[in-house]
């Protein structure tokens, strides 16, 4: 539970400064920042429900999953063409130096967002139908969110999990991508 809360908090902190980063951003840099803010807001709005602080609302989870999925995958990667690392951007050069890993993370977010929608029928903290083997579900733990050597998350297995656990995986994907590919700004 503490690890889940720490992950959600860290993920929230990593994206909390995005709004301030819009100063001077134009064109595609501004477009991708707007997409990241939409994802940040989605995670922020769903966090109290996933922590049990507000009543569970399946429709809110479905809306959030759709928003995450809409900004992930190819939609996300299209917003990072080479040469779009101007001064207003928080994108690190590593995105273009290790495009395969960045692209894999964007695709993982899309998979996990789809699984979040599927898991919406599994309220937070509900029992899973059978034991979950994390090595097949998420490529061996942290590696799922990181490098390109991980196996892809199993969307069917994720969809069987309690929705709060799938939400945590989504937050971990965001956090891992930001850790590797987003520059820190003061």
Q: How would you label these PLM feature ranges?
A:
Residues 22-53, 58, 62, 66, ...:
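Sequence context surrounding c-type heme c attachment/ligation sites in exported
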Residues 1-9:
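Bacterial N-terminal signal peptides that target proteins for export
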Residues 2, 16-26:
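Extracytoplasmic entry segments of secretory-pathway proteins
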Residues 8-16:
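Bacterial N-terminal signal peptides
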